[in-house]
Amino acid sequence: MKISEEEVRHVAKLSKLSFSESETTTFATTLSKIVDMVELLNEVDTEGVAITTTMADKKNVMRQDIAEEGTDRALLFKNVPEKENHFIKVPAILDDGGDA
């Protein structure tokens, strides 16, 4: 199945993307090749092949919910450049520099 450059431009516009003409041509060619490869899967004979939903045999692995000793706060804050009231202080990211 051939993906046209017009289709690439249409999807790009919907996605609010812009591409040069050479990029549009490259995408159209590449996407056409990808679709052709996927269409080859329709030709594979899967008669008698069991449906596969997952390749992993693992089920949910549960563990006991047991409280454990945490890491020492002093050790956690050892390399923190700035702290305030037991919290790591970071530069303000809001325009006004105020509290969040």
Curated annotation (Swiss-Prot):
Assembly mode: Heterotrimer of A, B and C subunits.
Role of this protein: Allows the formation of correctly charged Asn-tRNA(Asn) or Gln-tRNA(Gln) through the transamidation of misacylated Asp-tRNA(Asn) or Glu-tRNA(Gln) in organisms which lack either or both of asparaginyl-tRNA or glutaminyl-tRNA synthetases. The reaction takes place in the presence of glutamine and ATP through an activated phospho-Asp-tRNA(Asn) or phospho-Glu-tRNA(Gln).
GO BP terms in the entry: glutaminyl-tRNAGln biosynthesis via transamidation; regulation of translational fidelity; translation
Molecular function in Gene Ontology: asparaginyl-tRNA synthase (glutamine-hydrolyzing) activity; ATP binding; glutaminyl-tRNA synthase (glutamine-hydrolyzing) activity
The keyword Nucleotide-binding belongs to this UniProt entry's keyword annotation: yes
NCBIfam families: gatC (TIGR00135)
Similarity annotation: Belongs to the GatC family.
Classification via Pfam families: GatC
Organism: Streptococcus pyogenes serotype M49 (strain NZ131)
Class of this enzyme: ligase
EC assignment: 6.3.5.-
Annotated protein name in UniProt: Aspartyl/glutamyl-tRNA(Asn/Gln) amidotransferase subunit C
Domain of life of the native organism: Bacteria
Keyword terms, alphabetized: ATP-binding, Ligase, Nucleotide-binding, Protein biosynthesis
Reaction it catalyzes: L-glutamyl-tRNA(Gln) + L-glutamine + ATP + H2O = L-glutaminyl-tRNA(Gln) + L-glutamate + ADP + phosphate + H(+); L-aspartyl-tRNA(Asn) + L-glutamine + ATP + H2O = L-asparaginyl-tRNA(Asn) + L-glutamate + ADP + phosphate + 2 H(+)
